[in-house]
Regions:
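Soluble catalytic regions of large protease machineries
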Residues: 1-169
């Protein structure tokens, strides 16, 4: 049985380059089911366990491996050698561990708030979509676009800076 560290390593190394903004959107999307339970039903269930586990691992990776935290800093505590699988020590102090934990909680709270805003802004349409799904058991892209509007186009990355050629002397 593979350890969680090995599985996380496989997940991290199989990913393509992702920006912090893309990860925040992905995390908010993952939390949307739990947020929806709270907004629409007024309670939480155990149904989001897998989502919470994935989000927690992803945010710890953002903070402790990819240096995507201003508070913790641009530093990586990731050990690509695999040596940490055998040792039960962290390559940082308890104070840093607490900073990492605090930052992870703050980032998850921020993504949760993003999901809440999005769901609340689209509550009427989501209710209509849910009713349609209960009625027909399937909805199509056209239904979603009619109810919620067309999907926003993906943001293009910034254009590369043009280079000027110099004449050979």
């Amino acid at each position: 049985m593979e350890s969680d560290i090995t599985l996380l390593h496989e997940w991290l190394t199989s990913r393509q380059i992702t920006t912090k903004e893309q990860w925040m959107d992905e995390i908010a999307s993952t939390l949307a089911g739990r947020v929806s339970e709270q907004i629409f039903f007024g309670h939480l269930s155990t149904g989001a366990l897998n989502d919470l586990e994935r989000v927690t691992k992803q945010v710890y990776a953002m903070v402790a491996y990819y240096g995507m935290s201003e508070k913790v800093g641009t530093i990586s505590y990731y050990d690509s050698t695999g040596q940490s699988d055998m040792a039960f020590t962290k390559p940082y102090s308890e104070r840093t561990a607490q900073q990492i934990d605090d930052e992870v909680k703050a980032i998850i709270a921020e993504a949760y708030a993003m999901a809440e805003r999005t769901i609340n802004e689209n509550r009427e349409g989501l209710t209509e979509l849910a009713e349609l799904l209960l009625e027909r058991e399937v909805v199509f892209t056209e239904d979603v676009e009619r109810i919620l509007g067309p999907r926003e186009p993906k943001q293009e990355s910034a254009p590369e800076t043009e280079t000027t050629e110099t004449a050979e002397v």
